[in-house]
Amino acid sequence: MLYYAAPMEGFTDRVWRQTHQKWFGAQGAADRYYAPFISPPENRVLIKKKMAELAPAANPGAPVIPQLLAKDGELAAWMIEQLRALGYTEVNLNLGCPAGTVTAKGKGSGMLRDLAKVDAFLDGVFSRAEGPVSVKTRLAKMIMLSLCAFIWKRRILLIIWKRHAKRMIFTANRR
């Protein structure tokens, strides 16, 4: 069985990843550590402090997967290029964050309200970005088939976090 460490903003940073590897060693360390999300800057100027979190030197030996939170496919593709330049082979797109501050901006699970926008976003990413890109999401019954069609069309590795699925179905039906 593979062990993936889920991202939790403000908790699973590089210090946590290093400590986890140190104390649990090769036998107990995660097979992958998903980094807390970063949003690509609209002005396309990287923020040094945020990029320091993902610097390979700050994550020695840790198989880290950067996670992007975006709603513009072209901008996300640009950010993926920047992460590839740092040596990352896989990048994860976050379509699952249920936080109100995120969904209000049409990002994370807020993007799932408009499947045409999801399709356009994924087209923007996959028409420009190269290499493996996975998608983290939460699935509500009403969108599962459509979203799976988008995923299948692009041969995306899909990661589903089940924990809040019931809450998401409830809140999605209220809107």
Question: Which residues are covered by each model-predicted region?
Answer:
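Conserved phosphate-coordination/catalytic loops
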Residues: 70, 112, 116
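Intrinsically disordered, low-complexity segments enriched in small/polar residues
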Residues: 1-2, 31-32, 86
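Short glycine-enriched, charge-decorated loop/helix-capping segments at active-site entrances
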Residues: 106-112
